[in-house]
Structure formats: C-alpha cells, structure tokens
Regions:
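Residue-level detector of alpha-helix boundaries and kinks
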Residues: 17, 77, 144-147
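Active-site neighborhood of glycoside hydrolase catalytic domains
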Residues: 23-114
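N-terminal small/glycine-rich loop or linker at the start of catalytic domains
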Residues: 6-24
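Mixed-charge, polar/low-complexity N-terminal
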Residues: 8-9, 13-14, 83-84, 140, ...
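Conserved alpha/beta catalytic core and glycan-binding cleft of carbohydrate-active enzymes
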Residues: 89, 93-174
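Intrinsically disordered regions, especially transient/low-confidence alpha-helical propensity segments
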Residues: 20, 35-36, 141, 152
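Short hydrophobic/aromatic-rich motifs at helix boundaries and adjacent loops
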Residues: 7-9, 63, 130
C-alpha cells in the first residue's frame, strides 16, 4: 500500500489500518514481549493470538504468479513460502507466556500435520490452537466465498479425525 506522504509502501495482509509488523526486527520483538509481560504482570492468565502464523514472511518479496483476474497474487503465498516461524514462536513463548505459565490459543491455519507436536502441548509453542479442519471443507476453488455444500457425515468425520490426531499431544480449540 502506498503512503502518500513519503512515497513509501507498507504491507498489510488484513485491513489497511493494520500494518504488518516486521518480526525480523529485534527491537520490535523486545517491545512486544514487554507489552505482553505488562499484561501478564497485571494478572492476565492467557492470550488468544490471532494470525500468529503470519509473523514470518518471505522478505525476498518474490514475484508470485497471479491467481486472480486483477493480475495480483494472494498475500498468503508470502507466508507459505517463508521458513523459520517456529524460532520466532519459541522466542515469543520463552520471553513471555512460559514465565507465567499462561494459557495460549494460537490461530494457526496452514500448519502441516507433522508439525502439530511443535505447536501444541507440553512443549508446543501454544497451549492449544484453533481447529480449522472443518473450515477447510468449505473452501471452494476461490476460497471461502464460493463454498461448496457440506454434508453432515463428512463434517463429523473431519472433526473426529482432527481430534483423534491431536489427542496424542493435547487438544484443539473450536
């Protein structure tokens, strides 16, 4: 997005009023930890952390193939092609939540199944994560806005399968 005043740009994956933060910046991360710990010092016992998987991006800014008629590519491709989010999440946990034994729920929507133990449970980045398995059933060719019809049996099997897969490590929030 172009900023008229300085002829500079900033990245926002959501609303233009919500610029993405550069988690590669050590000073920024330390300030975030300071703010989180301030709340935990006040007695807050947990955090819901939305869109946390988006903190790591491919800052090489590759030119992705367009995936829409407007000639643009979806911003999630920038997150999918990034590596190293686990290191940032572990640093976040160790500098904040772990010190207070705080309960955390992470919004993690593109995790690979084999990564589940890294994300939840005793040694995971979070206490639990939201379960997006049923939401994935409603993604049509162009995302959630052209969702196909879902029958109850498919939905039930998907939820049950996700919970059975997760029980070895912890649980998922719904």
């Amino acid at each position: 997005r172009q900023m008229c005043i300085r002829d500079r740009y900033y990245l926002h994956m959501f609303a233009k009023e919500q610029p993405d933060l550069n988690w590669e910046n050590e000073k920024l991360r330390q300030k975030l930890y300071e703010m989180i710990n301030w709340w935990l010092d006040k007695g807050l016992s947990g955090f819901r952390i939305d869109a946390i998987i988006n903190i790591k991006k491919n800052l090489d800014f590759p030119d992705f193939e367009p995936d829409a008629e407007d000639g643009l590519a979806a911003c999630y491709k920038m997150v999918e092609s990034a590596e190293g989010v686990g290191e940032l999440l572990e640093e976040l946990k160790n500098n904040t939540f772990k010190k207070y034994d705080a309960f955390t729920v992470g919004e993690v929507f593109n995790m690979k199944p084999e990564e589940l133990p890294e994300f939840i449970g005793e040694n995971g980045h979070f206490s639990t994560i939201f379960d997006f398995c049923a939401q994935c059933l409603s993604d049509g060719e162009h995302g959630w806005y052209d969702a196909p019809e879902i029958d109850f049996d498919t939905w039930r099997k998907t939820i049950l399968g996700s919970q059975l897969e997760t029980e070895k490590y912890g649980f998922k929030a719904n």
